[in-house]
């Protein structure tokens, strides 16, 4: 159980930093140590990889995290959250793909592992006052409540991935690099002699690493090959499984050499689950790529106050997208909590299973899962 937010001086305040072996968490630990906090690190193992797996960098990440903690003269704890990860993140990931949707496991990992399992373990078992992570996001106390604020570095802002956090979690979390731009973070690391200063940022889904996504997913879900049809209903190719494709996808469709097809590239515009057919259209302005709105469910508001009437705000339907103005309206006749989002301008490649995240200026209000599109 989380207690009231800490008011002790830094030297009396214990902070457990989630150490990933990357530069952002390294600098987070360094800055907190410089500010006088009692700092310890914690490395989470969330995936039971095959020891012979040449693609997995977990052991190198642990080695780097240990080297940073040794350099800073702080203790490094390690913990295995693989069971929690499998039950709460990976099974969700598989279920969504099986349902023909495109999930974002990083958001679920933040919700279930980093800001639930890790936060509870740090506070309850290690006696922490706070946890800290290397996320590019800020928190601010406004009107006596904690708000999630976009990271200063607009190119690295990670509030999109953290919309499930609530005020209690924000009250117990520090984001030491949220007010710093990425190049400066690397400069701080280099000046401090941290070996991660030039380490490449991790990309892709954590449990897949550098492996090919198609090969990995095929180990867990049986592929169901089928036909690719044009939006006009003409067969134009074959797919290896709908789960390997997402709306707006252009690459890897293997469509070509069709008479009278023209030169414009093909894009995925829909997935027909009942017929196991992938539907494609030509050109990035194909009308079936666009939506004027969406229905979202599984909503999380940072203040945990559900809407009772419409609001005007801005929204992102994918990471690093420019904000889009919209109206958010609760659907009162729905059996589950659902919201209708109407864009002021039509949006391309909005994808069911991905997250829609709401903003008011620099404040992240919350978000939810895209369920259906309004065209």
Curated annotation (Swiss-Prot):
Q: Is tRNA processing there in the keyword field? A: yes
Tell where it localizes. Cytoplasm
Recorded superkingdom? Bacteria
Question: What is the top EC class of this enzyme, as a single word?
Answer: transferase
Q: What is its EC number?
A: 2.8.1.13
Main location group:
cytoplasm
Q: Which SUPFAM superfamilies match?
A: Adenine nucleotide alpha hydrolases-like (SSF52402)
Q: Which GO terms describe its molecular function?
A: ATP binding; tRNA binding; tRNA-uridine 2-sulfurtransferase activity
S-S bridge residues: 109-206
Amino-acid positions noted as binding ATP in the UniProt annotation, renumbered to this chain: 18-25, 44, 134
The record's keywords, sorted A to Z, are: ATP-binding, Cytoplasm, Disulfide bond, Nucleotide-binding, RNA-binding, Transferase, tRNA processing, tRNA-binding
Region Interaction with target base in tRNA, residue ranges: 104-106
Q: Where is this site: Interaction with tRNA?
A: 135, 354
Record field: catalytic activity: S-sulfanyl-L-cysteinyl-[protein] + uridine(34) in tRNA + AH2 + ATP = 2-thiouridine(34) in tRNA + L-cysteinyl-[protein] + A + AMP + diphosphate + H(+)
Extract the Pfam families matched here. tRNA_Me_trans, tRNA_Me_trans_C, tRNA_Me_trans_M
A GO BP annotation:
tRNA wobble position uridine thiolation
Q: Residue ranges of region Interaction with tRNA? A: 156-158, 318-319
Q: Which residue positions are annotated as catalytic?
A: 109, 206
Which NCBIfam families would you find in this protein's record?
PRK00143.1, trmU
Q: What does this protein do?
A: Catalyzes the 2-thiolation of uridine at the wobble position (U34) of tRNA, leading to the formation of s(2)U34.
Protein name, please?
A: tRNA-specific 2-thiouridylase MnmA
Gene source species: Colwellia psychrerythraea (strain 34H / ATCC BAA-681) (Vibrio psychroerythus)
């Amino acid at each position: 159980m989380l207690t009231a937010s800490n008011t002790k001086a830094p030297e009396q305040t214990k902070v457990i930093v989630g150490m990933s072996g990357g530069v952002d968490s390294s600098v987070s630990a360094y800055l907190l140590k410089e500010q006088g906090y009692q700092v310890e690190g914690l490395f989470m193992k969330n995936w039971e990889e095959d020891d012979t797996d040449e693609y997995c960098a977990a052991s190198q990440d642990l080695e780097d995290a240990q080297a940073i903690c040794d350099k800073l003269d702080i203790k490094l704890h390690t913990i295995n959250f693989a069971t929690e990860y499998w039950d709460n993140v990976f099974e969700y990931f598989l279920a969504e793909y099986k349902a023909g949707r495109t999930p974002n496991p990083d958001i679920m990992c933040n919700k279930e592992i980093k800001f639930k399992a890790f936060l509870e373990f740090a506070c309850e078992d290690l006696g922490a006052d706070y946890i800290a992570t290397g996320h590019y996001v800020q928190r601010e106390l406004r009107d006596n409540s904690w708000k999630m604020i976009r990271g200063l570095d607009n190119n690295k802002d990670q509030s999109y991935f953290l919309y499930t956090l609530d005020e209690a979690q924000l009250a117990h979390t520090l984001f030491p690099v949220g007010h710093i731009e990425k190049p400066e973070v690397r400069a701080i690391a280099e000046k401090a002699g941290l070996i991660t200063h030039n380490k490449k940022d991790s990309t892709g889904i954590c449990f897949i690493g550098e492996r090919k996504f198609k090969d990995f997913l095929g180990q867990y879900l049986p592929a169901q090959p089928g036909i690719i049809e044009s939006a006009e209903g003409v067969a134009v190719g074959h797919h290896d499984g709908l789960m390997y494709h997402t709306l707006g996808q252009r690459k890897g469709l293997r469509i070509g050499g069709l008479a009278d097809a023209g030169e414009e590239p093909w894009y995925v515009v829909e997935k027909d689950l009942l017929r196991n057919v992938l539907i494609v259209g030509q050109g990035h302005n194909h009308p079936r790529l666009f939506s004027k709105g969406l229905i979202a469910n599984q909503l999380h508001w940072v203040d945990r106050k559900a809407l009772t009437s419409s609001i005007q705000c801005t929204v992102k339907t994918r990471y690093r997208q420019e904000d889009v103005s919209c109206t958010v309206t609760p659907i009162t006749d729905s059996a589950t909590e659902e919201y209708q989002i109407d864009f002021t301008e039509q949006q391309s490649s909005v994808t069911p299973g991905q997250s829609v995240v709401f903003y008011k200026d620099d404040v992240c209000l919350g978000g939810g899962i895209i369920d259906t599109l309004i065209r």
